[in-house]
């Protein structure tokens, strides 16, 4: 449980930094690239928080991000709509790892406000549901 609390604190800082950049109306290329890196880190730390939460409080062993997302829906942490967006976010995260394409970076940056809101909601729901 201590590991989960530490990860939640990291997730809080990461999501806050993502939200800070995502709230802008437009970005320089450097800001956009920084925002994508913040997204990558925020996503990674948050799905791992959710994985720890599932293991500790629900006795569910989910190894992959997509499985963690689906299990979060099954137990009520994410709605069907949030799950759909989280799965898309997971796919986008995978693409950022394997590809750098200017067009994709522009498309992804347009989704950052929504992704930031979803990550914030997911984080708060995990915190709220913790005993």
Predicted segments with their positions:
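Solvent-exposed interaction patches of small proteins and small membrane subunits
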Residues: 1-131
């Amino acid at each position: 449980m201590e590991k989960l609390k530490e990860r939640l604190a990291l997730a809080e800082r990461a999501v806050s930094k993502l939200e800070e950049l995502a709230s802008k109306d437009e970005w320089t290329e450097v800001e956009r690239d920084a925002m994508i890196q913040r997204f990558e880190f925020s996503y990674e730390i948050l799905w791992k928080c959710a994985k720890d939460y599932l293991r500790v409080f629900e006795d569910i062993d989910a190894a992959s991000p997509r499985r963690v997302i689906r299990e979060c829906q099954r137990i009520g942490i994410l709605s069907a709509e949030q799950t759909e967006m989280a799965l898309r976010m997971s796919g986008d995260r995978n693409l950022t790892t394997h590809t750098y394409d200017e067009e994709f970076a522009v498309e992804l940056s347009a989704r950052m406000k929504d992704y930031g809101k979803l990550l914030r909601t997911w984080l708060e729901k995990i915190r709220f549901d913790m005993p």
